[in-house]
Amino acid sequence: MLNVGATAPDFTLRDQNQQLVTLRGYRGAKNVLLVFFPLAFTGICQGELDQLRDHLPEFENDDSAALAISVGPPPTHKIWATQSGFTFPLLSDFWPHGAVSQAYGVFNEQAGIANRGTFVVDRSGIIRFAEMKQPGEVRDQRLWTDALAALTA
């Protein structure tokens, strides 16, 4: 997993609406919360992204943006986003399979999916918060809000 202080690898991925999203597009403008999740329509992932949705103004505002990333394809993400009311981008790390997850060091080779990795990237592209949970472990989203708040203090 990439460490705090490292430069966040740039990427271009398709969201649930087939739109291209690049990390560098936020450079100089917003801090970015990157939330890697294993798969759509799974218990812990549903719960975590429901919490993100329910507290979205804390993560998606004038100072920050939230991007969720998994190896699932955009059509699956579209259905899940529609059913769950997710308005933030769900990015597809589908092909090359898991390339962005691998670049961030959160790809689970054995399972072929991303582990629950979370990164806060500042406006200059530097990682200011990094964590990774193993399958079955739930993340504490208060850590994300604290990390983002520290960048705007």
Swiss-Prot record:
GO cellular component: cytoplasm; cytosol
Catalysed reactions, as listed in the record: [mycoredoxin]-L-dithiol + a hydroperoxide = [mycoredoxin]-L-disulfide + an alcohol + H2O
SUPFAM superfamilies registered for this protein in UniProt: Thioredoxin-like (SSF52833)
Superkingdom in the source lineage: Bacteria
Misc. comment: The active site is a conserved redox-active cysteine residue, the peroxidatic cysteine (C(P)), which makes the nucleophilic attack on the peroxide substrate. The peroxide oxidizes the C(P)-SH to cysteine sulfenic acid (C(P)-SOH), which then reacts with another cysteine residue, the resolving cysteine (C(R)), to form a disulfide bridge. The disulfide is subsequently reduced by an appropriate electron donor to complete the catalytic cycle. In this 1-Cys peroxiredoxin, no C(R) is present and C(P) instead forms a disulfide with a cysteine from another protein or with a small thiol molecule.
EC number: 1.11.1.29
Any one Pfam family match given in the protein's UniProt record, by short name: AhpC-TSA
Residues the record marks as active site: C45 (cysteine sulfenic acid (-soh) intermediate)
Protein's name according to its UniProt entry: Alkyl hydroperoxide reductase E
Domain Thioredoxin intervals: 2-153
Function: Thiol-specific peroxidase that catalyzes the reduction of hydrogen peroxide and organic hydroperoxides to water and alcohols, respectively. Plays a role in cell protection against oxidative stress by detoxifying peroxides. May represent an important antioxidant defense against cytotoxic peroxides, especially peroxynitrite, which can be formed by activated macrophages during infection.
MF terms in GO: peroxidase activity; peroxiredoxin activity; thioredoxin peroxidase activity
Highest classification ranks of the organism: Bacteria, Bacillati, Actinomycetota, Actinomycetes, Mycobacteriales
EC class name: oxidoreductase
SS bonds (residue pairs): none
Keyword Oxidoreductase: yes
UniProt entry keywords in alphabetical sequence: Antioxidant, Oxidoreductase, Peroxidase, Redox-active center
Keyword Methyltransferase appears in the UniProt entry: no
GO terms under biological process: cell redox homeostasis; cellular response to oxidative stress; response to nitrosative stress
